Design a protein with these regions (language model features):
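Short loop->beta-strand "edge-of-pocket" segments that line small-molecule binding or catalytic clefts
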Residues: 2-18, 31-32
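Paired acidic/hydrophobic, glycine-rich loop segments that form the ligand-binding mouth/hinge
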Residues: 12, 33, 51-56, 71-73, ...
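Beta->alpha turn/N-cap motifs
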Residues: 15-17, 37-38, 54-61, 98, ...
Length: 131
């Protein structure tokens, strides 16, 4: 977002987070300020003269509910795709079984149900795997 990546803007991020790495590589004009953790981003943002707090939407939504006067920008600046894997020495059959398990869990609604059961908001189930 050009409004965020502007000279004079400080963007507070959780130190060592995936979005810290992403923004470190992509921000050209704004400065990054690293909070001790992702949970500390908004408190660090509020305690200083910072312009932007960046983080995981669920955490920022919880902070916005806790602190009046905060607003979330629409959209997102990155997506973290989750994955499962196996050691290289596992058989092709093991790989196929894992792939089948994951695809079945997504298609059957098990993943969506687990997200709902655990009150996880602001996320979506990945589409079917390609190829």
């Amino acid at each position: 977002n050009a409004q965020v990546d502007a000279p004079g803007n400080d963007i507070v991020v959780g130190k060592g987070s995936a979005y810290d790495l992403y923004l470190s590589r992509h921000i050209q004009h704004a400065s990054l300020v690293r909070a001790a953790s992702s949970q500390a981003v908004v408190d660090t943002f509020l305690s200083g003269n910072h312009q932007v707090a960046a983080g995981v939407r669920q955490q920022l939504e919880a902070d916005a509910a806790r602190v009046p006067g905060l607003r979330l920008l629409p959209g997102r600046f990155m997506v973290i795709e989750q994955a499962m894997g196996l050691p290289r020495n596992r058989s092709a059959r093991a790989e196929a079984l894992l792939r089948s398990f994951v695809e079945h869990a997504k298609a059957s609604g098990e993943v969506a149900a687990a997200l709902q059961r655990n009150h996880v908001q602001g996320v979506s189930v990945a589409p079917p795997a390609r190829g």
